[in-house]
Curated annotation (Swiss-Prot):
SUPFAM superfamilies: beta and beta-prime subunits of DNA dependent RNA-polymerase. It comes from Bordetella avium (strain 197N). This is DNA-directed RNA polymerase subunit beta'. Keywords: DNA-directed RNA polymerase, Magnesium, Metal-binding, Nucleotidyltransferase, Transcription, Transferase, Zinc. InterPro entries: DNA-dir_RpoC_beta_prime, DNA-dir_RpoC_beta_prime_bact, RNA_pol_asu, RNA_pol_N, RNA_pol_Rpb1_1, RNA_pol_Rpb1_3, RNA_pol_Rpb1_3_sf, RNA_pol_Rpb1_4. It is an enzyme of class 2 (transferase). Its EC number is 2.7.7.6.
Length: 1413
């Protein structure tokens, strides 16, 4: 029977394809798809339920309703296959064809396609060079359009109203031709000469110089060239034939009760057909023009609604007043075709259940409930039952399984053996959210999960559910086992730290075991080996924490690399000695000989992984877990009220704080401080008091008094349960303990401001009603924040994945020697991230040379692993140039050397690894841990931030950076006059140890090359004011400084001294008052000039400056001329957390961005305009560049100052686009990486830099053509970098001029939408716009990325899929070569083709042959 069925199966050929092209369909093409014209709007007969003939469900056009059965029932059964019934006209075939056969409607009047009309920018408008408004008037029959002017002075494409048309007709008769409606538009499109238009436009482009015009022309040129290249005729944008979707894709389903549920499309099609038929009839009847016009307009509207309902005018609604879902709505949005069905599918062979903990499991196992396994593995069980002869048919087997015969369970055990299943916990934020395990059958209905993988899944056992999936094919099982098994994924791909780190009970147990206790039972006993310790412990002679001495066996490698046992004596504790049993060999006992806190255990597992390999580490982690659980149980640690010790000093501290607050209140009431200052001070006092109570409490908790062996009183670390839990990292933190036993402290109001009365009680004492009420707000806000955060974080991840999804490692080495120099990250003199952490796992770009001996220590192209990084540290290299994804020269994808180590595997990255997606997941996954709020810096918060001096942290020599400029004043002090001055401290080897920024006007207390001790002051400054320092000496001459006009006199009430303050000038009668400034005059009465130029020194003062010199006063170099109070700086909102990360990746320009100098040159000020000041920079060639700066901005430079290109000249946050333009890609990358890292570092999240670099590479993947040279581009066009480089290679090979370009920084959303793959862009956002554009350009999608391939249903070109695609392409090339060779043999006299082609192809490996490495 089966063989018989196979005979009748139609041969469905698997189409192999390499690209998908999208275009416009010509009317002929649409007719060729069609199986017949739909003439009637009827659907099915309401009595017989049979489809009406020529209707929307017609069986003649679309195929039979039942398999192999015509409609009237004359032909049934397979034997009539392919017969067309003469009675009802239906072909006898499978009913499945109703899903693929299309019909068509011949439109009585042409109709413009709404996408090309209304999708902005309007493509029709661009081609015709008319405004959208005009085209709409023509299309919807409100105006006439001249098609052929003939001999008249009218222009082609001119728009005329009805009255105009009548007037012109009277004037010229029928010398000209004008039409209205889609016919007019179609005629215009048909008669357009694209080649000529392109020529003219190219000519205009060369001739014009106005920016706006160039932009406009190049846009139009691009569209026209698209038509030219793709061979699509513009008049196809107007349809004469409308295709009809196959009926099974717009089904009509009978509901019970004789009603029908139908797809909205049927309604929309019915309207089109009705109006079209009416129009046909009117045309036959030769109805008056005005009626026809109305009918044509209605037809146009009906077709518009079918294609994209609601795009123009009011949306068509059904009977129940809801908008009908049109064809465009079917594909776009979250529930559209792309995101609902193509990118996310539901899968068979899956189940979900609650998870419980399975501490007895090994790391690679999970507990699967028997009933679930029975259901999931049904087909395998059926197969097995048949093979064993226990069941003859599937049906019988089904019966056996359903009755749950004992034999079935045995078979289930067999089937499940070595068959991994995949577990997934939603939300799957990174690749560790799905892992494979070997199932172990268990009773019950809950899945058991190994405790160590919880961190990776972010799972807990408070009711979480997980889904199980079964990989079916052998290949799938193999991949699940080798790539996804939990024991093969022990490192986080985000940062290379172990992911199987014990937590909570396990940590507590291990910590409790490895602590020491002074004077424990049996202290100081010597033991021969661990077994003896175990006996003594079992007999109660010693406690776990007793200090003892014991002989332990360790394993070390000898010269031959064999393991040799070594016995050493260690002073340790009983617990540690017993734990030493589980150490893998290769780790010395010293790693265990300390109290194991969570960080220590993580480091221990990391060390084990690097030294002993994966297998031993997994076994070790499992044993650690078992011991931890056992010991925590044995330890019997619990919490009691008594453990929360309230510090005795609490009352004293609170009383003291209360007194200080009263004092401040008194000052306020006598008017000495303002209310704002009083509030700030009060908040400050209570904040400090809270910290003091917390400190006192921790001191009391952390230690306890004991008597040691010699009878002395000593303090030891406490065994208080709460303290142990926090200290070990098992649960809780100092801040939480402070609320339990200290005081709760200050609370925030709903608007974010701090309530000035703190909660002085703690949870042990209990809160009163008011205190409880105050604290409710904060608790609720936390919950609301979390919900918002999750959604935002998910959206950020989606955008990141979308922009990087096509980035895959495609080759081993691109051969570049470019890279970025890495140094240790230093901020405020402290090393935040040492050099070793930054270069670990990267590849050296150039040889690394020992600074002392000048010998090459590490050659270029070496992967820097732990040992090499240690070597670099030892040798004393402080700057290493490493390869980075940003400088990789691979065209599509990345090379393995530029990426470096695969952090999730700990080895060199493999070709085919989807590093883009991994980067996106690594950045998006911790997103939910980031905060959502915007911080207001001001008041109490900023006071702590005011520094007024820098000190060295280490001994060394001072070195001034090249940017550091200073003058020496009369007292011999050095005064800094550079904006970006830096000062470094070098150690004896000349390595930079620390680096400090020195602000403008600071007094530098050390000289270049001075030796300093740690703690030396380097520079001091006044934190509250910013000085203006004179760089030259002379007598002061005031200009434009008039009291009451530009300055005001302020008298200090306390001291009686008066100062001049610069105010906003009052303009009198339109006379513009110059800005107040001073010139310096030398002894001869001439203006002092700036050294090396003939500019006079003039120093202008900003509004709010306090002038400290008098007119005519002699000033020396380095003297302060004026001070600008810093209080006047407004409180800035600092965007933090998730919004800040999104802002950086979207490359948004900040609201009031700072300005960077466009050129290197000298600053001067021009004439001010209204509300703006004019700043001029004269470059070295003497060309001046002007900038207008709003008055309220703070200018950081003054007259005569020399600035470097890219230096800050106006205060404010930096704009990434400016950084890219003025300082280049490297600076931009550093800026984005550092800023993103700052946000994550604040939350204690570790992410490797290279992930952020990968994203930045994708943001920089487009370039802007400035000069096309001889290449095939348009000026101002944005193209993919790889496309540009390929084109330039081609042009250079022909000895022509390559195109010049600028780098462009795109935000991640923009970058995703501007990708070359239209499928990927359409499935991301703005589907209609993307598809419209792609169709006109006749775009071809080469299916390079992962997303496109998922959508078309192929294996993705990453991992094992990449190998598959490469092999497939090789095979195709080989077959082509063989065909070519065969053709040559058959016809030897034909001209020989170029031999090179064939040679290249034949040198590919043949089947069964492996390519030589």
């Amino acid at each position: 029977m089966k063989a018989l069925l196979d005979l009748f199966k139609q041969v469905s050929q698997d189409e192999q394809f390499d690209a998908i092209k999208i275009g416009l369909a010509s009317p002929e093409k649409i007719r060729s798809w069609s199986y017949g014209e739909v003439r009637k709007p009827e659907t099915i007969n309401y009595r017989t339920f049979k489809p009406e003939r020529d209707g929307l469900f017609c069986a003649k056009i679309f195929g039979p309703i039942k398999d192999y059965e015509c409609l009237c029932g004359k032909y049934k059964r397979l034997k009539h296959r392919g017969v067309i019934c003469e009675k009802c006209g239906v072909e006898v075939t499978v009913a499945k064809v109703r899903r693929e056969r299309m019909g068509h409607i011949e439109l009585a009047s042409p109709v413009a396609h709404i996408w090309f009309l209304k999708s902005l920018p309007s493509r029709l408008g661009m081609v015709l060079d008319m405004t959208l408004r005009d085209i709409e008037r023509v299309l919807y029959f409100e105006a006439w359009c001249v098609i052929e002017p003939g001999m008249t002075p009218l222009k082609r494409g001119q728009i005329m109203s009805d009255d105009d048309f009548l007037a012109k007709t009277e004037e010229y008769g029928d010398d000209f031709r004008a039409l209205m409606g889609a016919e007019a538009v179609r005629e215009l499109l048909r008669t357009i000469d694209i080649d000529r238009e392109v020529e003219t436009l190219r000519g205009e482009l060369k001739a014009t110089s106005s920016e706006a015009k160039i932009k406009k022309i190049s846009k139009r040129l691009k569209v026209l060239e698209g038509f030219q290249k793709s061979g699509i005729k513009p008049d196809w944008m107007v349809m004469e034939v409308l295709p009809v979707l196959p009926p099974d894709l717009r089904p009509l389903v009978p509901l019970d009760g004789g009603r029908f549920a139908t797809s909205d499309l049927n309604d929309l099609y019915r309207r089109v057909i009705n109006r079209n038929n009416r129009l046909k009839r009117l045309l036959e009847l030769k109805a008056p023009e005005i009626i026809l016009r109305n009918e044509k307009r209605m037809l146009q509207e009906a077709v518009d609604s079918l294609l994209d309902n609601g795009r123009r005018g009011k949306a068509m609604t059904g009977a129940n007043k809801r908008q009908l879902k049109s064809l465009a709505d079917m594909i776009k949005g979250k529930s559209g075709r792309f995101r609902q069905n193509l990118l996310g599918k539901r899968v068979d062979y899956s189940g979900r259940s609650v998870i419980v903990v399975g501490p007895q499991l090994k790391l690679h196992q999970c507990g699967l409930p028997k009933l679930m396994a029975l259901e999931l593995f049904k087909p395998f069980i059926f197969n097995r039952l048949e093979m064993m002869g226990l069941a003859t048919t599937i049906k019988a087997a089904k019966k056996l399984v359903e009755s749950q015969e004992p034999v079935v369970w045995d078979i289930l055990e067999e089937v499940i053996r070595e068959h991994p299943v995949m577990l997934n916990r939603a939300p799957t934020l990174h690749r560790l959210g799905i892992q494979a395990f070997e199932p172990v059958l268990i009773e019950g209905k809950a899945i058991q999960l190994h405790p160590l993988v919880c961190a990776a899944f972010n799972a807990d056992f408070d009711g979480d559910q997980m889904a199980v999936h079964v990989p079916l094919s052998l290949e799938a099982q193999l991949e699940a086992r080798t790539l996804m098994l939990a024991s093969n994924n022990v490192l986080f791909p985000a940062n290379g730290e172990p992911s199987i780190v014990p937590s909570q009970d396990i940590v507590l147990g291990l910590y409790y075991t490895t602590r020491e206790r002074i004077n424990g039972r049996g202290e100081g006993i010597f033991f021969a080996d661990v077994a003896e310790v175990q006996r003594a412990y079992d007999n109660g002679e010693v406690e776990l924490q007793t200090r003892i001495t014991v002989r332990l066996k360790e394993h070390e490698r000898d010269e031959q690399g064999e393991w040799q046992p070594v016995i050493r004596r260690h002073e340790t504790t009983v617990g540690r000695a017993l734990l030493s049993e589980i150490l893998p060999r290769g780790l010395p006992f010293t790693v265990l000989n300390k109290a194991l806190k969570k960080k220590e255990i993580s480091r221990l597992i990391n060390q084990s992984f690097r030294r002993c390999g994966l297998r031993d580490t997994v076994i070790f982690a499992d044993k650690l877990m078992q011991s931890g659980f056992r010991l925590a149980t044995r330890g019997g640690i619990s919490i009691a009220m008594e453990d929360m010790l309230i510090p005795a000093a609490k009352e004293v501290i609170l009383a003291e704080a209360g007194r200080e607050v009263k004092e401040i209140d008194k000052q306020y009431s006598s008017g000495l401080v303002t209310s704002q200052e009083r509030y700030n001070n009060v908040v400050d006092i209570w904040g400090k008091a809270g910290d003091k109570v917390g400190k006192a409490m921790m001191e009391q908790l952390a230690t306890e008094p004991v008597v040691n062996r010699h009878g002395e009183n000593v303090r030891q670390e406490s065994f208080n349960s709460i303290y142990m839990m926090a200290d070990s990292g098992a649960r809780g933190s100092a801040a939480q303990i402070r609320q339990l036993a200290g005081m709760r402290g200050l609370m925030a109001k709903p608007d974010g401001s701090i309530i000035e009365t703190p909660i002085t009680a703690n949870f042990r004492e209990g809160l009163n009603v008011l205190q409880y009420f105050i604290s409710t707000h904060g608790a609720r806000k936390g919950l609301a924040d979390t919900a918002l955060k999750t959604a935002n974080s998910g959206y950020l991840t989606r955008r990141l994945v979308d922009v990087t999804q096509d980035l895959v490692i495609t080759e081993v080495d691109c051969g570049t020697s470019h890279g970025y120099s890495m140094k240790a990250l230093v901020e405020g003199g402290e090393v935040i991230e040492p050099l070793r952490d930054r270069i670990l796992g990267r590849v050296a770009a150039v040889d690394i040379v020992n600074p002392d001996t000048q010998e090459t220590e590490i050659t270029a192209g070496t992967l820097l692993d732990e040992d090499l990084v240690d070597l670099i540290d030892r040798v004393g290299v402080d700057e290493v140039k490493v390869r980075t994804p940003l400088t990789c020269e691979t065209r599509h994808g990345l090379c393995a050397h530029c990426y470096g180590r695969d952090l999730g595997r700990g080895s060199h990255v493999n070709v085919g690894e989807a590093v883009g997606v991994i980067a996106a997941q690594s950045i998006g996954e911790p997103g939910t841990q980031l905060t959502m709020r915007t911080f207001h810096i001001g008041g109490a918060a900023s006071r702590s931030a005011l520094a007024s001096a820098v000190e060295t942290k280490s001994n060394g020599t001072v070195g001034f950076a090249s940017t550091m400029r200073y003058v020496t004043n009369a007292k011999g002090e050095r005064v800094a006059i550079s904006r970006s001055g830096e000062l470094a401290i070098y150690d004896d080897n000349g390595r930079e140890r620390e680096r400090h920024k020195i602000p403008y006007g600071a007094t530098v207390l050390v000289g270049d090359g001075d030796a300093v001790k740690a703690g030396t002051r380097l520079a001091t400054w006044d934190p509250l004011t910013r000085p203006i320092v004179s760089e030259y000496g002379g007598a002061v001459r005031f200009e434009n400084i008039e009291e009451g006009v530009t300055v005001a006199k302020q008298v200090d009430e306390v001291t009686g001294l008066s100062t001049l303050v610069v105010i906003t000038p009052k303009t009198r009668g339109g006379k513009v008052v110059m800005r107040p400034q001073i010139k310096l005059v030398n002894d001869n009465g001439e203006d002092v000039r700036i050294a090396g130029t003939d500019h006079a020194v003039n120093i202008s003062f900003p509004v709010g400056a306090l002038i400290t010199v008098r007119d005519g006063q002699q000033v020396a170099v380095g003297e302060v001329l004026a001070r600008i109070p810093q209080e006047s700086q407004k409180t800035r909102d600092i965007t933090g957390g998730l919004p800040r990360v999104a802002e950086l990746f979207e490359a948004r320009s900040p609201k009031d961005a700072g300005m960077l100098a466009e050129v290197t040159g000298t600053v001067s000020f021009g004439k001010d305009t209204k509300g703006k000041q004019r700043l001029v920079i004269t470059d070295l060639e003497g060309i001046s560049h002007e900038f207008l700066i709003p008055k309220e901005k703070q200018v950081l430079v003054h007259d005569g100052q020399v600035v470097n290109k890219g230096e800050m000249i106006v205060d404010g946050p930096a704009d990434p686009h400016d950084i890219l333009r003025l300082q280049g890609i490297e600076k931009l990358a550093t800026y984005i990486v550092d800023e993103v890292q700052d946000v994550y570092r604040l939350q204690g999240v570790k992410i490797n830099d290279k992930h952020i670099e990968v994203i930045v590479r994708q943001m920089l993947r487009r370039v802007n053509i400035t000069d096309p040279g001889d290449a095939d581009f348009i000026p101002g066009e944005q193209v993919e970098r790889s496309e540009l480089l390929n084109e330039n290679d081609r042009v250079i090979a022909e000895d022509k001029r390559p195109a010049q370009y600028d780098n462009v920084l795109l935000g991640i959303t923009k970058a995703s939408l501007s990708t070359d793959s239209f499928i990927s862009a359409a499935s991301f956002q703005e589907t209609t716009r993307v598809l419209t554009e792609a169709a006109i350009m006749g775009k071809r999608d080469d299916l390079r990325g992962l997303k496109e391939n998922v959508i078309v249903g192929r294996l993705i070109p990453a991992g094992t899929g990449l190998a598959y695609h490469l092999a497939r392409k090789d095979k195709e090339a080989l077959e082509a070569a063989e065909r070519e060779a065969a053709r040559q043999q058959a016809n030897p006299f034909e001209e020989m083709p170029v031999a090179a082609d064939i040679e290249v192809d034949v040198s590919l490996p043949f089947e069964g042959e492996t390519p030589a490495e």
